[in-house]
């Protein structure tokens, strides 16, 4: 696994060269947890940089990359940006494809296949479940009352 400053198709070596895509081609699997987003600008226009924990797998090579920042193709950027509102974290997992296209100057366009539905994340859910599993099960109301009566009688006898 390689840690990169930002996760993009280019940084993981999965961005096709212009006019090189002749058939639908799987490029990368990207998944993670989005905690926030910032708008940035480049020579190609505005983009959204997502913040959180992300991993990307170059499907052609199998290499795995990890980063705290993520920049996505527009087709996915708009879908994910709508799910992130700054108050919640969002878990997602997608596969990104390139398919031949006459539009634009690259000769291809991106497609996205969701591997899971983007969903708000309950970050404490796993910890909560571990704590519940570690605690003894609560006694039934009748059992607790039955155990309390003999203990109270024994205490009263000891004090007398």
From Swiss-Prot:
Keywords: DNA-binding, Early protein, Nucleotide-binding. GO terms for molecular function: DNA binding; nucleotide binding. The keyword DNA-binding applies. Binds to single-stranded DNA (ssDNA). Has a regulatory effect on phage DNA metabolism and transcription of early genes. This is Single-stranded DNA-binding protein. It comes from Enterobacteria phage PRD1. The lineage of its organism: Viruses, Varidnaviria, Bamfordvirae, Preplasmiviricota, Tectiliviricetes.
């Amino acid at each position: 696994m390689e840690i990169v400053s930002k996760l993009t198709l280019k940084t993981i070596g999965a961005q096709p060269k212009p006019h090189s895509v002749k058939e639908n081609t799987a490029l990368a699997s990207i998944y993670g947890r989005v905690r926030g987003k910032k708008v940035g600008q480049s020579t190609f226009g505005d983009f959204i940089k997502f913040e959180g924990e992300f991993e990307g797998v170059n499907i052609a090579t199998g290499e795995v990359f990890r980063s705290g920042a993520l920049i996505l193709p527009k087709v996915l950027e708009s879908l994910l940006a709508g799910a992130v509102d700054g108050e919640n974290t969002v878990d997602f997992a997608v596969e990104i494809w390139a398919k031949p296209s006459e539009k634009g100057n690259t000769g291809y366009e991106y497609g996205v296949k969701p591997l899971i539905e983007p969903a708000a994340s309950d970050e404490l859910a796993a910890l909560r479940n571990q704590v519940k599993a570690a605690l003894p099960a609560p006694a039934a109301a009748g059992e607790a009352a039955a155990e309390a009566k003999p203990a109270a009688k024994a205490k009263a006898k000891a004090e007398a």
